[in-house]
From Swiss-Prot:
Keyword Zinc appears in the UniProt entry: no
GO cellular component, one term: NADH dehydrogenase complex
Source organism: Peromyscus melanotis
The reaction(s) this protein catalyses: a ubiquinone + NADH + 5 H(+)(in) = a ubiquinol + NAD(+) + 4 H(+)(out)
Name of the featured protein: NADH-ubiquinone oxidoreductase chain 3
UniProt gene name: MT-ND3
Biological function: Core subunit of the mitochondrial membrane respiratory chain NADH dehydrogenase (Complex I) which catalyzes electron transfer from NADH through the respiratory chain, using ubiquinone as an electron acceptor. Essential for the catalytic activity of complex I.
Length: 115
């Protein structure tokens, strides 16, 4: 009964907060909020310039490699397992995939900034 009451209160409170979060911004429509911040000066040009696709690809590559490294973080705790061979094989496969991905990026010249 207590858990049901807590669940009901949590759902009600979160629903109320979501409704308020969607309702409040519509009350105060202020057109200057959409303009870019230019330190008090009028904008000289468009603030929405497209950025380099090369930068985007390098950033995505960094995120993918960072995620793969994050998968290796629990490795010291996994050493305490009884079957260490399976854990080491899994870590070796993960590092091999990481190395193959890095080699592929290197061959495809995905890590070079200049063209």
């Amino acid at each position: 009964m207590n858990m049901l009451m807590a669940l009901l209160v949590n759902i009600t409170l979160s629903t109320l907060l979501i409704i308020v979060a969607f309702w409040l911004p519509q009350l105060n429509l202020y057109t200057e909020k959409a303009n870019p911040y230019e330190c008090g000066f009028d904008p000289m040009g468009s603030a929405r310039l497209p950025f380099s696709m090369k930068f985007f690809l390098v950033a995505i590559t960094f995120l993918l490699f960072d995620l793969e490294i994050a998968l290796l973080l629990p490795l010291p705790w996994a050493i305490q397992m009884y079957n260490i061979n399976i854990m080491m094989l899994t870590a070796f496969i993960l590092v091999s995939v990481l190395a193959l991905g890095l080699a592929y990026e290197w061959v495809q010249k995905g890590l070079e900034w200049t063209e």
